[in-house]
Amino acid sequence: ETAAGAYPIEAVQTMVKIAESTEASINYRKRFKERTTLVNPDITNAISHACCTTAMDLNASAIISVTKSGFTARMVSKYRPECAVVACVMNKKAYRQLNLSWGVTPIMMCQLEKNTDQLFDLAVDTAEKTGIVQQGEVVVITAGVPLGVSGTTNLIKVHVVGHVLMKGKSINDKVVSGNLCVCKTASELL
């Protein structure tokens, strides 16, 4: 049955059901764990694989890839991570192309920041504003240094979505984090 046939709507509905049931029946986590070696052991591929492994181990809500050409986001996508794959791009061509990649949600970023900390904050804030990630969730971020140069993917950061309201030192000299509740009255403490 084709679009020229007597039942084009039913044909498309059947194709959708087949595609959805096929995607749902594949255990991507198992397939990922069974993969023993990288097919193309270059830096971008290794970083993409490490991002997926880290996201799976930490049950991250998203992998955020700051990418100029979209290549890193596509490399992450090929491993079929369970979490969202967000591609932060600065040009429309890469944005349009990434709309066709499996599991990738491209979002436009208006500017390129001067350092990685600012860039990561902007990428996470942009993903949060679009509703892809929420406060308190863990995300894995990947990008390349020098910033804005295609083909330089070389770093990973694990980040908790939210803004640091205060810093201090724990009793055991280790890094800790937690939720902070700001109360203005004693009754709000309860």
How would you name each of these model-derived features?
Residues 13-52, 152-186:
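Long, charged amphipathic helices and adjacent flexible linkers at domain junctions
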Residues 134-147, 154-157:
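C-terminal binding/interaction regions
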Residues 16-26, 55, 80, 84, ...:
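Structural signal for hydrophobic packing residues in well-ordered secondary-structure cores
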Residues 43-60, 119-137, 184-189:
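Phosphate-interacting basic helix/loop segments used at nucleotide- and nucleic-acid interfaces
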